[in-house]
A protein has these predicted regions:
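Residues at the starts of beta-strands that form the adenosine-phosphate
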Residues: 9, 32, 240-243
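Conserved FAD-binding catalytic core of PHBH/FMO-like flavoproteins
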Residues: 73, 83, 104, 108, ...
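Conserved mid-domain beta->alpha element of the FAD-binding
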Residues: 12-32, 36-39, 165-168, 192, ...
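Short, flexible helix/strand-to-coil boundary loops that buttress conserved ligand/catalytic motifs
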Residues: 46-47, 65-66, 75-76, 177-178, ...
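Short glycine-/acidic-enriched loop or helix-start segments at secondary-structure transitions
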Residues: 22, 45, 137-138, 174-177, ...
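Accessory recognition modules or surfaces
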Residues: 1-12, 17-18, 38, 42-57
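Active-site-adjacent segment of FAD-dependent monooxygenases/related oxidoreductases
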Residues: 42-120, 129-130, 386-387, 392-393, ...
Length: 434
């Protein structure tokens, strides 16, 4: 008879959606987990964050993790349609370039999805206000030791575990230690972002106008392509509108470890004036009415060749920082977590040597790395197309006003990303009916 080993312990660095997804997947695989997160408490209300799209596979994975799968639909709206528009800023008119009525995404606010996953986990696994400092693997490679600072007291604590999971985002401290020569690549543009709560002004001129200009809001991912710029627009649950506007500019000076940049009132006023020039009046009005817009600096990273080391594994943006144009960031993190959990469940048996763990990590890497590498590069390409940046020296930048054949816009649709609908076979058991 083969007996399962006693529970192993994973230390997860990062308490965002990727970290929470890993926690759930590993608990279901029979592991104990502890989550180290530098934030002092779980996010409440609406912190700096915005809308995110969930593809069909990510939806199914999340629902398999919930005791009440229907809860996902209570905090999301459907995105059945993926529509790309060309906009002439001078004439203030838009027209359809592409329309896919079978996207089958759902859209959530970051806070709502985070709360859904957080409430599906035991409270005791979280160590809030803990800043990751360093880690090392024991000489005999039987455990990993993590050092963290308790931010409230400045105390340095050590945590031992069998596996370190780095889910600490695109500027991952864990990745920096393992791959010091790997640097983030500035995309050439930043993104203004905002969420407008219209729950108390549903009949305002702004909301009536935006619904007339974008009649499929509540079921559509709108992309507006202007001259060397583009924007996205979606409706979120609880009467909120989420917009993003990508602007070509030199790389800003980054302060701290966040890709979110503080903005001044002067910057906001300048942005409002530009919106009037670039977009149709309805979209410009929405942008101007949104309180507390913020700026994300857009980075990605050339694909790496390795995301596992002995007892350390990278997931999500820590493994493959990506631009946001193909809706991959959250979806890749969720799929990374699900695959890692299933690989550990498959390989962690009765054998007392480390071969089981290594086999699990190697299979995780072999499944995910080829896919994420292609998707990161495709998203980079799509971003450069939409921003009117050169792809090749002999290829002219994309001009949406001059696009008049399917070859001109085939890369714009979400479903044309590599491996768009692929489901790793190791996940088959998650969706088998009982």
């Amino acid at each position: 008879m083969i007996l399962k080993k006693e529970k192993q312990k994973a230390i997860i660095v990062g308490g965002s959606i990727g970290g929470l997804s890993c926690a759930k997947a590993l608990i279901l695989a029979g592991w104990d987990v502890v989550v180290l997160e530098k934030s002092h408490a779980p996010p409440m209300g609406s912190p700096t964050g915005a809308g995110l799209g969930l593809d069909t596979l990510a939806q199914e994975i999340i629902q398999s993790w919930l005791s009440q799968p229907e809860l996902l639909h209570r905090v999301t709206l459907p995105l059945t349609i993926d529509q790309n528009l060309a906009t002439d800023g001078a004439k203030k008119v838009s027209w359809v370039l592409t329309r896919d009525e079978n996207l089958n995404f759902r859209v959530a606010h970051w806070t709502d999805l985070h709360g859904l996953l957080y409430n599906a986990l035991p409270n005791e696994i979280f160590q809030w206000g803990h800043l990751y400092l360093s880690s090392c693997i024991s000489d005999d490679k039987t455990f990993v030791k993590v050092k963290a600072k308790v931010l409230q007291t400045d105390e340095i604590v050590e945590v031992d575990g069998d596996l370190l999971v780095a889910a600490d985002g695109s500027r991952s401290s864990v990745r920096q230690c393992l791959l010091p020569d790997v640097k983030l690549r500035y995309s050439g543009y930043c993104a203004w972002r905002g969420v407008l709560d219209f729950s108390e002004c549903e009949n305002s001129e702004t909301i009536v106008g935006i619904r007339k200009a974008y009649p499929d809001l509540g079921n559509c991912l709108y992309m507006d392509l202007g001259s060397r710029t583009h924007s996205t627009l979606t409706e979120l649950m609880y009467k909120r509108l989420n917009w993003i506007w990508f602007v070509n500019q030199p790389e800003p000076e980054l302060k701290g470890n966040s890709v979110t940049m503080k903005v001044s009132n002067d910057m906001i006023r300048t942005m409002h004036r530009e919106a009037d020039k670039v977009w149709v009046p309805e979209l410009a009005g929405l942008v101007k009415e949104t309180k507390d817009p913020f700026v994300n600096i857009i980075y990605d990273c050339d694909p790496v060749e390795q995301i596992v080391w002995d007892r350390v594994v990278l997931i999500g943006e820590a493994a493959h920082p990506t631009t946001p144009h193909c809706g991959r960031s959250t979806n890749m993190s969720i799929l990374d977590a699900a695959v890692l959990g299933k690989c550990l469940d498959k390989w962690w048996g009765a054998d007392e040597n480390n071969s089981n763990l290594q086999s699990a990590l190697e299979e995780y890497q072999s499944i995910r790395l080829p896919v994420t590498s292609k998707q990161v590069l495709h998203s980079r390409k799509v971003g450069r197309i939409k921003q009117g940046l050169r792809l090749l020296p002999d290829r002219q930048p994309f001009d949406p006003k001059a696009a008049n054949s399917p070859e001109d816009w085939q890369d714009l649709q979400q479903r044309n990303i590599p491996h768009f609908a692929d489901v790793p076979s190791i996940l088959d058991s998650m969706f088998c009916s009982t």
